[in-house]
Amino acid sequence: MQRRDDSSARMGRGPGGPGSARQGGPNPRRSPRGGGGRGAGAQHPQPLLTGGAAAGSSGAQGPAAANPAPLLPGGAVKMEPENKYLPELMAEKDSLDPSSTHAMQLLSAEIEKIQKGETTKKDEEENYLDLFSHKNMKLKERVLIPVKQYPKFNFVGKILGPQGNTIKRLQEETGAKISVLGKGSMRDKAKEEELRKGGDPKYAHLNMDLHVFIEVFGPPCEAYALMAHAMEEVKKFLVPDMMDDICQEQFLELSYLNGVPEPTRGRGGPVRGRGAAPPPPPPVPRGRGVGPPPPPPPPRGALVRGAPVRGAIARGAAVARGVPPPPAVRGAPAPRARAAGIQRIPLPPPPAPETYEEYGYDDAYADQSYEGYEGYYSQGQGDTEYYDYGHGEAQETYEAYGQDDWNGTRPSLKAPPARPVKGAYREHPYGRY
């Protein structure tokens, strides 16, 4: 009986005794079968389970949900700000009026950034500049105009210039896009107020203070250099001085645009007319170079300068030599000018006889032409020959004149009847008759 009890005891102790004695081996395997949650919960509280795993267990939902939070402080601390910021954004988005489309877009974009975790990445990328990729970047700066310090000075007019020419030149010099924005940037105040109240995002700058907006686009180094140069140039226009070089140039340009220089141009017209008179002088030197053929130049020169008279009587230079006294030369301009007319008109000679007597025209042509006439006279007297050279003059006059000359008498240049003959002899060398 004792053996049976022992065997039954062994059989009864088998599941309990060995299980209790060998807790390390079989108990973990049998615990899921027999619902040994108590023993497992009592002996193994499972402190390393996360909140989700602890919530899945049926026996330790309360303590397991409360205990894991302090066990993982890092994760809870990281998630707390995002969990607080995201619901606030969602609540603001729901509370917004549907008509505010821009605010809705901004909130939705911010929510997406937080959900994707892109905020830190973008912030890190914006803090670095890539100088080797040569990518263009856009720089924007707003320079405040000191309107509050100098309310009576027209900074906008000084920056824009007459008809906007000043700001156009400034943009060309700096290579930046420059514009004047803010309150007071528009000339029509009523229209500015209307646009400000309209709520158009294009005119949102009207709610800002008056400023100069500078925008540059290019590689990083060039963009910052252009921005610095543009700001330095804009700074010159923010000086409230009406007597500086910039304002003086603008006043001069405004006078040109308003038509003030037109009278000066009208003055320049007569000046050009006077300058048009110089163009005739070029033909005058040409007439001088050509000689007597052009009729206008000689009389002009003879009347004004007197040099053309000398040039006209250059062939009779010996005659000028025979007239040393200056008073005769002074009184000769009118006849000399007429002498130029004599060259134009062969037969009608207007000059006075005294002038030709003083010139002593015989001295110039005595040695050259009268030898031939002496030969003709010694050989024979031809009426036709004397008719050609004397224009129908009597032979007696020629005989007396020739004998007197070659006998060397020269009775004080007595040749009044031979004056037309002198004109004939004068015309003969030119070959006109």
Curated annotation (Swiss-Prot):
InterPro entries: BBP-like, KH_1_KHDC4/BBP-like, KH_dom, KH_dom_type_1_sf, Qua1_dom, Sam68-YY. Pfam families: KH-I_KHDC4-BBP (PF22675), Qua1 (PF16274), Sam68-YY (PF16568). The keyword 4Fe-4S does not apply. The keyword Transcription applies. One of its GO terms (molecular function) is RNA binding. GO terms for cellular component: cytoplasm; membrane; nucleus. Residues 41-76, 329-342 have a biased composition (Low complexity). Residues 1-79, 259-305, 317-351, 403-433 are annotated as: Disordered. It is found in: Nucleus; Cytoplasm; Membrane. One of its GO terms (biological process) is regulation of RNA export from nucleus. It comes from the Eukaryota. Residues 82-243 are annotated as: Involved in homodimerization. Residues 171-197 form the KH domain. Residues 424-433 have a biased composition (Basic and acidic residues). Keywords: Acetylation, Cell cycle, Cytoplasm, Membrane, Methylation, mRNA processing, mRNA splicing, Nucleus, Phosphoprotein, RNA-binding, SH3-binding, Transcription, Transcription regulation. Transmembrane segments: none annotated. Tyrosine phosphorylated by several non-receptor tyrosine kinases including LCK, FYN and JAK3. Acetylated. Positively correlates with ability to bind RNA. Residues 277-300 have a biased composition (Pro residues). Recruited and tyrosine phosphorylated by several receptor systems, for example the T-cell, leptin and insulin receptors. Once phosphorylated, functions as an adapter protein in signal transduction cascades by binding to SH2 and SH3 domain-containing proteins. Role in G2-M progression in the cell cycle. Represses CBP-dependent transcriptional activation apparently by competing with other nuclear factors for binding to CBP. Also acts as a putative regulator of mRNA stability and/or translation rates and mediates mRNA nuclear export. Self-associates to form homooligomers when bound to RNA, oligomerization appears to be limited when binding to proteins. The KH domain is required for binding to RNA. Belongs to the KHDRBS family. This is KH domain-containing, RNA-binding, signal transduction-associated protein 1.
